[in-house]
Structures are given as C-alpha cells and as structure tokens.
Design a protein with these regions (language model features):
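Sec-dependent signal peptide recognition
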Residues: 2-9
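N-terminal signal peptide c-region/cleavage motif recognized by signal peptidases
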Residues: 14-18
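Short, recurring structural edge motifs at helix starts
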Residues: 20-24, 126-129
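Solvent-exposed loop and edge beta-strand segments that line ligand/cofactor-binding
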Residues: 21, 25-28, 215, 219
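N-terminal extracytoplasmic segments of bacterial inner-membrane proteins
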Residues: 24-51, 133-161, 224, 228-236
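Secondary-structure edge/capping motif, primarily at the C-terminal ends of alpha-helices
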Residues: 40-51, 70-73, 92-99, 124, ...
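Heptad-repeat alpha-helical coiled-coil/4-helix-bundle sensor or tether segments in soluble regions
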Residues: 54-116, 137, 183-217, 221-232
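Extended amphipathic alpha-helical interaction segments
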Residues: 103-198
Length: 240
C-alpha cells in the first residue's frame, strides 16, 4: 500500500511531468510564443509614427499564455527559455520612450530564447505527434503562417535577421508554398470544413502580396490582423 502511494506521488513530481506534455499543449505553447514575438516586433517597430496599443496587449497576452501553458509541466529547457524571454521582455519595456537604438540589444536575445523554446517544443512534439493526420497538417499549417508573419515583422529590424533568423532568398517563397499546400491537404483530409478553409485561404491570399513583395508598402498591422484571423480560426477548428 505504501509502495503504491509512493509511486503515485513520484508521478506527480514536476520533474516527471514533461513526459505528459501532449502534442496539443506543445502546439499551443508554440503558437502563443510566435504570436507574442510577432506582436512585440509590430509594437516596437521603429519605423512607425505611433505604436498600436493592440499589439502591446496581444504580446503580453501571448507571453502570459506561454507561462500558463508551461506551469507545472516540468520541462527544464522550455522553462529556462521562457524565463529568458520574460527577462528580456522586462528589459525592453524599461527602455525609455524614443530610444529605438536600444531595442535590438533586448530583442535579439529574446528571439534567440524563443528559438530555443520552439526547438525544444518541436523535439517533444516529434516524439509524440497527434494520432490524426489532419490535426498534424493543421498544426504544420498554423506554424508555417506564424513563421511567415514573424519573418515579415522582423524586416523592420535589419540587424535581427543577421543575428537570429536563419533565412535566405528562398525562405519566404518556400513557406508560402508550404502554406498553400497545407490548405490543399487539409481541405482534402477534412472535406466537411473545405468551404471554411477556402475562406481562410482567401484571407491569406489577400495579404500575401505584401508578405512576398518587399517593394510594397509596409503593413505590419494588416499582416498581423489577417494572418491572426487565419491562425485563430485554425486553432478553434483544432479544438472542436
């Protein structure tokens, strides 16, 4: 009796909890982290006349969401990366208004910590992927859209791409191709939602020229709005 009780208590220890991190929770962690970083870059964009407070609210919600999803899960690598992101965020928020030249020194290590968090979450996800192929397709599609949005928002910070983001001339077209293929695959795997998926693809296609053509006018708010609509609805479909 005592042995059985001991085993139960051991299984409840936080250090063992990471084994129970589900594919869905890991996906949610990754989406919240991407959304937090993209909205942070949109809010601190040095090329805008005035920061949009909606991005401030959204990035804070995203960071809070990551913390909530990690609470009690017991994976040290995820927790350390999230703590580093939070620490760098606090440093960034203490920068006096108007001193935009100080942003990169805070944002670069924050995005590096995000990359570590995402890499670790991807490792855990690969070890226990979802059982249904359509859920796997949906997860990949959502993450590809979030990656593309983060790349777009990072263009306002020329030095960030050099130090943090592993990109070349083919990265954006490749992501765009994966996104279109993801919509096609998901519609085939989930015919009951094909009409709604077509509408979401229309939202993506509407903002797509701005994302792919760097000579077009800069629209960080519109990019966040339209792509955010797509990923939010995909997450809702995922939860149904």
């Amino acid at each position: 009796m005592h042995l059985r009780l001991l085993l139960v208590l051991l299984l409840m220890l936080p250090g063992l909890a990471s084994a129970s991190l589900s594919a869905q929770r890991l996906q949610d962690i990754r989406l919240e982290a991407f959304a937090a970083c993209s909205n942070l870059l949109a809010f601190y964009n040095p090329n805008q006349q005035a920061a949009d407070p909606r991005h401030l609210e959204r990035y804070r919600q995203g960071f809070h969401g990551v913390q909530q999803l990690l609470a009690g899960q017991g994976d040290a690598a995820l927790e350390e990366a999230a703590a580093e992101m939070r620490s760098r965020l606090e440093e960034l928020e203490r920068v006096p208004a108007g001193q935009v030249e100080l942003y990169p020194d805070r944002i670069i290590p924050l995005l590096k910590a995000h990359a570590r968090l995402d890499h670790r979450a991807a490792e855990l996800y690969a070890a226990a992927p979802p059982a249904e192929q359509r859920q796997l397709t949906l997860h990949r599609l959502s993450l590809d859209i979030e990656r593309l949005l983060l790349l777009y928002q990072s263009r306002a910070f020329s030095m960030i791409g050099m130090y943090v983001l592993d990109v070349d001339d083919n990265t954006v077209p490749q992501l765009d191709g994966q996104i279109h293929q993801g919509f096609a695959d998901l519609a085939a795997q989930w015919p009951g939602h094909s009409a709604e998926l077509a509408k979401l693809k229309q939202n993506y296609d509407f903002i797509r020229p701005r994302l792919l053509q760097h000579d077009r006018a800069w629209v960080p708010g519109s990019a966040a709005y339209y792509l955010g609509q797509v990923t939010t609805r995909l997450a809702q479909l995922d939860a149904e």
